[in-house]
């Protein structure tokens, strides 16, 4: 399945959460790569129901009495407008400030640099 969306700026929290050691290890286990400490946010025209694609669920954890939620990941391939691509994953935390129209994508490298992306660029997601 192919989905198209636009690159948008995030809330700046992805780098903190992806950088937490328990998340980093879990994402490596589930995706096969150690994620870059940050996410690429992609805004869709319609709500996206991740559960339709059998995502992999992961549990939350606790650090110094603070709880961090689990979530789901789905392996995808992301393409820029020139057709360059990379294997990466949609990550959907159980607790998020994003709408169901915004996807957070993790990858082993910084996607904006690797795929030469800027805000409002169209990307293709292949599931």
Curated annotation (Swiss-Prot):
Family: Belongs to the archaeal riboflavin kinase family.
Functional note: Catalyzes the CTP-dependent phosphorylation of riboflavin (vitamin B2) to form flavin mononucleotide (FMN).
Residues binding Mg(2+): 39, 41
Highest taxon above the source species: Archaea
Organism: Methanococcus maripaludis (strain C6 / ATCC BAA-1332)
Record's protein name: Riboflavin kinase
Residues binding FMN, per UniProt: 96, 104
Swiss-Prot/TrEMBL keywords: Flavoprotein, FMN, Kinase, Magnesium, Metal-binding, Nucleotide-binding, Transferase
Catalytic activity: riboflavin + CTP = CDP + FMN + H(+)
Pathway assigned to this chain's UniProt record: Cofactor biosynthesis; FMN biosynthesis; FMN from riboflavin (CTP route): step 1/1
Pfam families: CTP-dep_RFKase
Cofactor-binding details, from the entry: Binds 1 Mg(2+) ion per subunit.
Cofactors: Mg(2+)
Organism classification: Archaea, Methanobacteriati, Methanobacteriota, Methanomada group, Methanococci
């Amino acid at each position: 399945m192919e989905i198209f969306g636009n690159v948008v700026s995030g809330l700046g929290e992805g780098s903190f959460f992806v950088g937490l050691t328990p998340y980093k290890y879990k994402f490596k286990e589930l995706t096969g790569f150690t994620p870059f400490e940050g996410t690429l946010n992609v805004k869709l025209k319609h709500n996206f129901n991740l559960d339709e694609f059998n995502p992999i669920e992961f549990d939350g954890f606790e650090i110094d009495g603070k709880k961090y939620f689990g979530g789901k990941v789905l392996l995808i391939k992301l393409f820029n407008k020139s057709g360059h691509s990379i294997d990466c994953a949609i990550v959907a935390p159980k607790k998020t400030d994003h709408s169901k129209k915004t996807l957070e994508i993790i990858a082993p490298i910084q996607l904006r640099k690797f795929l030469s992306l800027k805000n409002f660029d169209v990307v293709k997601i292949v599931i």
